Structure formats: C-alpha cells, structure tokens
C-alpha cells in the first residue's frame, strides 16, 4: 500500500507541466518580432539591390561611353602619329634643303667676296689709268702751247714761209713741221691704249653691274630662304605643341584607364558583396537533416533535464544548420554559376520564402516535439517496475477513485531530488544561452556589416 502511494506521488509529479507557458509565448513573440524585423530588413535589402542595379547599369553605360571615348582618342592618336610622321619627313627634307641653301649661300658669299676684290683691283687700275690719261693730256696741252709759241716767233721769217710752201699740207694747222709729225706718231699708241682701257673699263663696269645683279638675286634668294626657315621654325614649334598635346592626351588616357580599372575593381567588389549576401542567407533543411533533428529531439526528450520546446528545436536546427549552411553555400554558388542570368532580387525573394517555410517548419517541429515529449512522459510513467505486485496495482488502478489534486512532497529525499533538478536547470540556463539568440545575433551583425560595406563603397564613389 505504501508502494502504491509513492507511485501516485510520482505520477502526480510527472503530470505537472515541465515548461512555463509564459516562456513559450515570449519565445513565440520574440520569433515573430525577429521575423518582422527580417521582413523589414529584406525590403531594405531589396531597395538597396535595386539601387545597386541602377548604379551598375549607370556604370556600364559610363564604361561604354568611356570605351567609345578611348576608341576616339586612339583614332585621334593614330591620326596625330601619322601627322607627326609626315611632319618629321617634311622637317628632314627641309633640313636637307636648308643645308644645301646654306652651302650655296656660303659659296655665293665667297664668290661675292672674290668679285668684290676683283672690282677693287680693277677700280685701282682704272684710277691709275685715269691719272695717266690726265697726265698725258696735260703733257699734250703743254706741247701744243709750246708749238704755238714757237710758231708765233717764226711766222715772219722767210725760210719759214719757204718751208711752209714746200712742206706737204696737213689738216692740222698747228702741225707744220717734221717735229710735229713725230709727236703725232707718239700719241697714236697712247690713244689706242686709252681706247683699250676705256673698253676694259666699260667691260668691267658691265661685269660689276652683272655681279651686282647676281648679288641682289642671291640676296633675294637668301631672304626667301630665311623666310622659309622662319616658316619651318613656326611649323616646328607647332609640331612641338602638338607633341605636348599628344603627351597630355596620353596622360589623360592613362588616367582614364586607371579610372576604368578602379571602377572595374569596385564593380567586382560589389559583385563579391552581393555573393557574400547570398552566401550568408540561411538555407532550407534537407529531409535527412529533418529526420536527424527529429531523432535528436527524441533523444533530448529522454534526458533527465529537459529544455523548452523552442530551445530544443532551435538547438537541433542550429546543429543541422552548421553543415546545411556550408552545403547550401556550395549549392548556391553552383546554382549561381549555372544560372548566372537569374536576377538577384528573384533569388532574394526565393530565400525569403524559404526562410518563411523554415520558420513554419520550425513551429511545426516545436509542436511535434511537444507532442512527442507528452507521449514520452506517458511511456516513462508506465514501466516503473517489473514486480508482479505493480501489475496488480495497475489492474487495481481503474477501481480506484479519481486522483486527488497534487500535493507537495513531504519526504526529504523527494525535496532534495527536486531541488537538485531545479539547480541543474538553472545552471544550464545561466551558462548556455539559447542557440537561436546567437543565430539571430550573427544575422544582425552580418546585416550591419553589409550595410556598412555598401555605405563605404558609396562614399568611395562619391569621393572619386
């Protein structure tokens, strides 16, 4: 009879609820709030992804525009290179022509110097001959005057008249005697030499005039060459300015290439960020993992110290999520490689629906786990002992009146056992935080990190 009383106390103790309804409601409210927060965060991520798509399209258009500009600059550079080649060829030809003209000008200058020396020498000869002619003229005048004086003296003498009558007639009235005829014979070679000198002087003057004309022509050619040289210098300055412009365009092209490389790096960084966002998203459980979780839940239900239904379910799911997240990330990467054309918004939407399904499945697992725990309590309350007296007690149980309300245990052993169980549960709850809290904390930290990365990339774009 005493044994039957102890069995009744054990049954009443096992019939008491092992969890608190408030804890369950608080867990459900917390899960609902977290789901709402995740929905809001999902909307924000959708907006940010749309903005990223718009920015990506703008950057693609800008890259196309820059590529077109690069092609135009490349064509302009090629045209400038062709012009520079032509200018180089023209400059070389002009340098050769300039060298030839310089040599010709030097030769003409030497010739002019020689002709100038010849002119000076001839001018000296002309001066000497002119002085000699003047001297001969003075001598001739003196001789004529002397003859006139002599003729005046002898004009009234008879022999002179006889000589005049007998002498041959001369056209020159002043030459009336033989000595005068000798003077004329001496003057004829002087006149011939004088004529010859006059001819030489006239020829020299003609040569000097011709040389002066040639000199003026050479001076005009030198002036034309100098003008051409100045024009070539101006063209050379223009070519140097064009060369500087080409260097500036090359520097701008290098800057544009560096800017393009930096933008490509930024675009690749944003793609990596999107990939990390997708990889960090939770994945759905496989059926095998669900079975393993249910088996784990059943084993946990048999433990002497039980967790709440949400704690045990989330422990099982988080234990499965460690491998499922890795497999899911690999599967997501493979799907991303196979279906690169799929939109990221669609993937996020699918992940959101998968998260909702996972949440509903979590609630279903909690309910199933609660029912399994109830069945386990009923099963553990029955096989207490294999004594035939217990069978008699079980047969006699339907004949007993309904059980009385539960009473507080009166024995010290029962009190000590209950206190030990309560202390163990408190110690476990104080040491081990629930797994879902750590999971949600990790999710929020990753969301904040992605938001800070997006803001930093936008700040870098704005700074550039």
Swiss-Prot record:
Superkingdom to which the source organism belongs: Eukaryota
Record has Coiled coil as a keyword: yes
Biased composition (Pro residues): 399-409
Residue ranges of the TM segments: none
Coiled-coil intervals: 31-154, 201-264, 342-379
Disulfide-linked positions: none
InterPro entries: CDR2 (IPR026079)
Positions of region (Disordered): 371-419
Keywords: Coiled coil
Comp. bias (Basic and acidic residues): 384-395
Family listed: Belongs to the CDR2 family.
Official protein name in the record: Cerebellar degeneration-related protein 2-like
């Amino acid at each position: 009879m005493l044994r039957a009383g102890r069995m009744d106390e054990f049954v009443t103790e096992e019939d008491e609820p092992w969890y608190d309804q408030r804890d369950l409601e608080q867990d459900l409210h917390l899960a609902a709030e977290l789901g709402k927060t995740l929905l809001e965060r999902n909307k924000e991520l959708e907006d940010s992804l749309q903005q990223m798509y718009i920015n990506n399209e703008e950057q693609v258009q800008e890259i196309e525009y820059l590529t077109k500009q690069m092609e135009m600059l490349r064509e302009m550079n090629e045209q400038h290179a062709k012009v520079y080649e032509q200018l180089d060829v023209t400059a070389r030809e002009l340098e050769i022509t300039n060298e030839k003209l310089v040599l010709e000008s030097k030769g003409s200058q030497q010739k002019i110097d020689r002709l100038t020396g010849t002119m000076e020498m001839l001018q000296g000869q002309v001066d000497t001959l002119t002085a000699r002619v003047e001297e001969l003229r003075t001598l001739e005048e003196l001789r004529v005057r002397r003859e006139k004086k002599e003729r005046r003296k002898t004009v009234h003498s008879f022999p002179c008249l006889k000589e005049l009558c007998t002498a041959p007639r001369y056209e020159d009235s002043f030459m009336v005697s033989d000595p005068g005829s000798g003077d004329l014979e001496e003057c004829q070679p002087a006149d011939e030499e004088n004529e010859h000198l006059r001819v030489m002087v006239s020829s020299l003057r003609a040569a000097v005039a011709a040389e002066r004309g040639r000199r003026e022509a050479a001076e005009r050619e030198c002036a034309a060459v100098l003008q051409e040289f100045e024009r070539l210098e101006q063209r050379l300055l223009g070519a140097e300015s064009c060369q500087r412009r080409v260097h500036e365009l090359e520097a701008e092209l290098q800057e544009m290439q560096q800017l393009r490389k930096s933008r490509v790096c930024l675009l690749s960084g944003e793609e990596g960020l999107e990939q990390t966002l997708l990889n960090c998203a939770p994945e759905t459980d496989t059926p095998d993992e669900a079975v393993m979780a249910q088996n784990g839940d059943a084993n946990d239900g048999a433990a002497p110290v039980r967790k709440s239904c949400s704690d045990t379910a989330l422990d099982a799911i988080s234990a499965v999520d460690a491998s499922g997240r890795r497999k899911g990330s690999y599967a997501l990467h493979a799907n991303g490689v196979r279906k690169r054309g799929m939109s990221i918004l669609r993937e996020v939407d699918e992940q959101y629906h998968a998260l909702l399904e996972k949440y509903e499945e979590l609630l279903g697992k909690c309910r199933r786990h609660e029912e399994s725990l109830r069945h386990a309590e009923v099963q553990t309350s029955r096989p207490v002992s294999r004594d035939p007296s217990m069978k008699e007690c079980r047969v006699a149980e339907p004949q007993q009146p309904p059980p009385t309300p539960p009473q507080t245990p009166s024995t010290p052993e029962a009190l000590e056992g209950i206190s030990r169980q309560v202390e163990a549960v408190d110690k476990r709850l104080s040491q081990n935080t629930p797994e879902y809290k750590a999971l949600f904390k990790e999710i929020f930290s990753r969301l904040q990190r992605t938001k800070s990365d997006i803001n930093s990339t936008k700040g870098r774009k704005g700074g550039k």
